[in-house]
Amino acid sequence: MTTEVILHYRPCESDPTQLPKIAEKAIQDFPTRPLSRFIPWFPYDGSKLPLRPKRSPPVISEEAAEDVKQYLTISEHDAKSHSYDCTVDLLEFQPSLKKQHLTWSHTLKEQTNSGNLGKQSEKGKQHKRRSWSISLPSNNCTKNVSPLSKKLQDSLKALNLHSLYRARWTIEHTICNSQTLEDIWTKLNQIIRHNELPSCNATIQRHLGQIWVFCDIMYCEYVGSLLKGRLALTGKINLFVHKYGVIFSM
């Protein structure tokens, strides 16, 4: 009896001495070993159960069994004779109820629901106040940008910071010059919409009483001067960089 073997191999495995050995191993029978006889871990002779309950099962008398049967028979009869009416307690199916009263109650309910929806929408409008503002890329506002001051350049050199790092100007509510933080935020949004602040995006932190204006460090002095002038800020604003803290003030 001959066996035909088709062997597929990779080009890197084209050694003529190894291919016959691989083919021989492929057609060899798998080694088998006899299974050992199963021996249970508990003593078992076939006539007794290995595990027994500690207590005997409860015994039900014939009288108790008859009582249970009678109870089940009565409950089944009641279930079959009961007619389920889905219109019970529904106002529309009560013949003594006038149609006008139903219409009035339905209208009152609609008015109540519409009032609740109006209140919810007003609350939603209050909470959906604008919190972020992002400027679009523009080359016009970068023409007036001057080189960084020597003081800021020295700080960047000492901290090994690149001029394209993002920094943050912090506007506190205490320097708004008799203006509210919302007034400053409205003016800032108008400035950003007109692309007067290069590479800037801003957010208002109402719970902190602050406005954060993010920009590249290479434009930070230009952005800071424009913020102080256009927003009429009276105090000092700080330039914050992540992991480095305040690196410059104006």
UniProtKB/Swiss-Prot annotation:
GO biological processes: DNA repair; negative regulation of double-strand break repair via homologous recombination; positive regulation of double-strand break repair via nonhomologous end joining; positive regulation of isotype switching; somatic diversification of immunoglobulins involved in immune response; telomere maintenance in response to DNA damage
Keywords, in A-Z order: Chromosome, DNA damage, DNA repair
Cellular component, GO, one term: nucleoplasm
Role of this protein: Component of the shieldin complex, which plays an important role in repair of DNA double-stranded breaks (DSBs). During G1 and S phase of the cell cycle, the complex functions downstream of TP53BP1 to promote non-homologous end joining (NHEJ) and suppress DNA end resection. Mediates various NHEJ-dependent processes including immunoglobulin class-switch recombination, and fusion of unprotected telomeres.
Region Disordered, annotated ranges: 108-129
Name of the protein this chain belongs to: Shieldin complex subunit 3
Gene this protein is translated from: SHLD3
Subcellular location: Chromosome
Assembly mode: Component of the shieldin complex, consisting of SHLD1, SHLD2, SHLD3 and MAD2L2/REV7. Within the complex, SHLD2 forms a scaffold which interacts with a SHLD3-MAD2L2 subcomplex via its N-terminus, and with SHLD1 via its C-terminus. Interacts with ASTE1.
Biased composition (Polar residues): 108-119
InterPro entries: Shieldin_RINN1
Region (Sufficient for interaction with MAD2L2): 28-83
